[in-house]
């Protein structure tokens, strides 16, 4: 599980790579659920969705910050 404070220290490229990994993980969890109808760790899907939301929030913040710096400079 990621914390927003730790994510803000990463670069935009690292965040996007982590986002891609999390999306793949969620896809695999969805496929596992559909094939087995039972999961060993049902909470993992919820945590992954929340991690993706945190990642997208920090990515958006960084993009806006970069955009504001280019507009002011």
From Swiss-Prot:
Please provide, alphabetically and separated by semicolons, the GO molecular function terms listed in this UniProt record.
structural constituent of ribosome
Q: Which gene encodes it?
A: rpmC
Alphabetical UniProt keywords:
Ribonucleoprotein, Ribosomal protein
Q: What GO biological process terms does the UniProt entry carry, in alphabetical order?
A: translation
Native source species: Protochlamydia amoebophila (strain UWE25)
Cellular component (GO) terms are:
ribonucleoprotein complex; ribosome
What family does this chain come from, according to its entry? Answer: Belongs to the universal ribosomal protein uL29 family.
Note down the stretches annotated as region Disordered. Answer: 1-20
- Name of a matching Pfam family: Ribosomal_L29
Q: What is this protein called?
A: Large ribosomal subunit protein uL29
What domain of life is recorded for the organism?
Bacteria
């Amino acid at each position: 599980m990621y914390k927003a404070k730790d994510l803000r220290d990463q670069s935009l490229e690292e965040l996007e790579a982590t986002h891609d990994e999390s999306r793949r993980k969620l896809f695999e969890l969805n496929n596992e659920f559909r094939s087995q109808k039972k999961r060993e760790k049902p909470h993992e899907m919820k945590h992954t969705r929340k991690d993706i939301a945190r990642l997208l929030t920090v990515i958006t913040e960084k993009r806006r910050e970069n955009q504001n710096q280019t507009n002011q400079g």
